Swiss-Prot record:
Name recorded for this polypeptide: Mitochondrial division protein 1
Entry's family note: Belongs to the WD repeat MDV1/CAF4 family.
Subcellular location: Mitochondrion outer membrane
Organism: Aspergillus terreus (strain NIH 2624 / FGSC A1156)
Cellular component annotations (GO), alphabetically ordered: mitochondrial outer membrane; transferase complex
Gene: mdv1
Length: 654
């Protein structure tokens, strides 16, 4: 039977169980000692690998010895087994498994370790401490106080805040605050040093940028000179190619020195008439044809794109009186200006120097246009003259044209020569058909349209040099009134202004012509039929300037307003006004610039609708002399040129 019970014990403890023992349970002192040794060995085996110090292993060993001693006492045994209904053998068999013993040995802590834990006298709970240790952004947004900033974290001294401070603690706190204050000073000095370093870097970058801009300006000047020389060589080659067939034809027709005088007299009267007709036509003066020699720009100037908007590029004292007309072909290219001093000057915008004068008109020039090499000027002498700048001779270093290479002049003589030199070879021909001053003109391709104070518009063929069509503005207005239309001549109801021309502005494109007149109306003409296609009514004063593109037409008037029209519907797309009358206007892809009777150019940004001023009057000293009023403006690719009442012409970035 004993053998059978020993074999049934799966834990190997059946050899210590006997029917008789302490308290009638069969558990003797020898059995308890054996059980204690096994538990001690098992616990030491389980806990030793997790202990890193020898003291920890000895601690567990002594704890097990104490447990063994307690279990050997009869009182302890009675208390332990008094409440159990089963024998200790059954308890050990059913409850104390290997997994449970391992779990209890790991999770249980002795009283010695628990006795060393200090008592927490802090009034903060564990959860409150966890909340205080977090970076509470919402709290900082609501409570932005300098004192509470950075004071959310709990510190060791917070628990002792309620206790009375000792001098030692106060000195310690003072030293800590003093050190923090010193660190703040060091950090401020570091920030100041970084700011100075950044300022120095920015200044160095500005200097480097200025150096690169100067280098770019030099490259563009050199590029302009090379392109000018290349254009001259191309023109010479074309002239040689034209002269070569003429010389070959002259050589192919030999002159007979033995010819009789009677051979020049023919018996056939028809032949005599043919000969006389040919000789007459050879002696008649025929107008020179315009030969379009386009300027071959391989690259456009980009220097002005690197300046801030509103920066001045050049200022030239161009004339001695008010500027009446101004135009240029492209940025840093060729500019032509006219004024009431009866002069027309050609300028090189790249260097800001006058290259010559266009002389031939008997009065002041009121309007002009430059396209490639061709310049058209309309004057108060009722004529339109055309000039070909590609025929000009090489310009000397002192700005003179047609200067002889022989001889040297003094500075005064050079200045006088510069003032009297003209581009005489550039004159092509004159268009004389108007009977009053020409106030507006525009040409594109082989077609030129001119408007005059004689209340007519004339269409010119630049190839033949003659007028092909005359448009009567008054007749068109009367015709529209007779047909019952809403377009008729509408007097403004006030005294005519000296600057209010009958034809204030015009522009043509193929068969389309837009014309603004003194009655405040803008008429759209069809050059194929010579009829008014549409009339735009809106201005209450004379129209002084206009320009259109594919979709919109922009007009300026003496009624102080600028109106943007939709060409597709004929309605007003946008409008704005200034304090004084608008005398000149032009736009590009980004901005609309206007001269509105002030010493600044009015600029309107198309994208955001922002209005700002550009010119010498911006930031001018109120006590000093005020710049003159802007009379004429021209804008191309962000390059602005404005002419003033005192004759000064300036170039700006816009």
């Amino acid at each position: 039977m004993d053998k059978h019970r020993r074999d049934e014990s799966p834990s190997g403890l059946s050899d210590i169980v006997e029917p008789d023992g302490l308290l009638g349970t069969g558990l003797t002192s020898r059995h308890i000692e054996a059980f204690g040794r096994k538990v001690t060995t098992t616990a030491g085996h389980l806990m030793a690998p997790s202990s890193t110090e020898a003291t920890t292993g000895s601690h567990y060993h002594s704890a097990m010895v104490d447990i063994q001693r307690e279990l050997r006492r009869p009182n302890t045994q009675r208390r332990v087994f008094s409440l159990t209904q089963t024998t200790p053998t059954d308890l050990v068999r059913s409850k104390l498994s290997t997994t449970e013993i391992q779990s209890r040995a790991i999770s249980s802590l002795p009283d010695d370790l628990l006795a060393n834990i200090p008592e927490d006298s802090s009034s903060y709970s564990l959860f409150e401490g966890f909340q205080a240790s977090q970076d509470d952004h919402e709290y900082r947004k609501v409570h932005r106080r300098r004192i509470s900033k950075g004071k959310k974290l709990l510190k060791d001294g917070d628990a002792r805040a309620a206790l009375p401070s000792t001098p030692t603690d106060l000195k310690k706190d003072r030293d800590i605050l003093s050190r923090r204050l010193d660190l703040m000073g060091v950090r401020k000095n570091m920030c100041s040093s970084e700011i100075h370093e950044i300022d120095n870097k920015i200044a160095n970058l500005h200097n480097m940028r200025k150096i690169v801009l100067d280098r770019l300006a030099g490259l563009e000047m050199e590029e302009a000179e090379l392109e000018h020389e290349l254009t001259e060589l191309d023109n010479k080659l074309e002239d040689l190619q034209e002269e070569q067939p003429e010389s070959q034809a002259a050589v192919a027709t030999p002159k007979s020195s033995e010819a009789n005088e009677d051979s020049f007299v023919s018996e056939d009267p028809a032949m005599d008439a043919s000969f006389m007709s040919e000789s007459i036509y050879q002696k008649m003066s025929s107008p020179k044809s315009i030969k379009q020699r386009s300027i071959r720009k391989r690259s456009m100037p980009i220097l002005h794109e690197h300046f801030a908007p509103g920066s001045q590029i050049k200022e030239m004292p161009a004339h001695n009186d008010m500027v009446t007309a101004i135009d240029f072909d492209f940025p840093f290219g060729t500019m032509v200006s006219a004024a009431l001093d009866d002069t027309v000057r050609v300028w090189d915008l790249n260097v800001g120097r006058c290259t010559g004068l266009l002389e031939g008109h008997n009065a002041s020039v009121r309007c002009l246009q430059i396209e490639d090499n061709i310049v058209a000027t309309g004057s108060m002498d009722a004529s339109v003259k055309l000039w070909d700048l590609s025929r000009a001779r090489s310009v000397t270093r002192d700005g003179r044209v047609n200067k002889d290479d022989e001889g040297e002049d003094t500075a005064d003589d050079a200045h006088e020569l510069f003032q009297s030199t003209t581009l005489e070879d550039c004159y092509v021909y004159s268009l004389d058909a108007h009977v009053d001053e020409v106030t507006a003109l525009h040409f594109r391709g082989d077609t030129l349209i001119s408007g005059s104070a004689d209340k007519t518009l004339r269409q010119w063929d630049l190839v033949k040099g003659r007028c092909v069509q005359t448009l009567d503005v008054l007749w068109a207005a009367a015709q529209a009134s007779t047909l019952g239309g809403d377009t008729q001549w509408r007097p403004s109801g006030r005294l005519p202004d000296a600057s209010a021309d009958f034809v204030g502005a015009l522009q043509c494109f193929d068969a389309a012509l837009a014309c603004g007149t003194a009655d405040g109306m803008v008429r759209l003409w069809d050059l194929r039929s010579g009829q008014v296609h549409r009339s735009l009514v809106g201005h209450t004063g004379p129209v002084t300037c206009l320009q259109f593109d594919d979709v919109h037409l922009v007009t300026g008037s003496l009624d102080r307003s600028i109106r943007i029209w939709d060409l597709r519907t004929g309605s007003i797309y946008d409008a704005y006004a200034y304090d004084k009358p608008v005398t000149s206007m032009m736009f590009d892809s980004k901005r609309i610039v206007a001269a509105a009777g002030e010493n600044v150019v009015k600029v309107y940004d198309k994208a955001d609708g922002h209005h700002w001023d550009c010119g010498a009057g911006v930031g001018a000293d109120a006590e000093g002399p005020s710049p003159a009023t802007v009379e004429r403006v021209r804008l191309k690719d962000g390059f602005l040129v404005e002419g003033r009442k005192d004759g000064i012409v300036s170039a700006w970035t816009c």
